[in-house]
């Protein structure tokens, strides 16, 4: 008989690696963005209230995506909003005003140049939803008989930064800049910016950044006309990047 070999102890299972913060941010950003796209599709079939809710989900997804870009690439990122007022040379460009959004990130090229580059396609909010600009909301953005609470602390207005003459690259290797897919153009934007650690750096007040959304009368190569000071939703974005939904005009 052959002598029995001593049994070998079972090998310990390799510990399972947990998700890193960056991976979680990317996954959450993708999930929320997909949910927002689905909400946009559904919003197109319903009332303006459904469109407003869908737009709220879309913007929340874009905020999460911008934060994930900053953390993933260890750079600065922005969620930018088209703010070049009509009339425009092209009526299609006028339709982008306060309704077209995009995530971009800052990159350093091989030659040392620092540029802003699109981190994904631009997204349009469902009709008839617009981003409410920072206070004061211009009176020519209001339908006759509508008045707006322009208190930056408590009113349904966005607290974003604004810059004019802005342009960015569609891709890192692009030879020229663009503005919302219009090559060689530049324009005005409102924006929210994240730092490499995923915190908001465009707001140093200590208060959450607000993005307000409302319904408007749209049409032609003209300014939108906000038609209800009470039909407003939006978001609070805290300095650490956490997002809270705001579901009424008095919730801001």
Residue ranges with predicted function:
Residues 2-7, 16-68, 72, 76, ...:
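N-terminal helix-rich module
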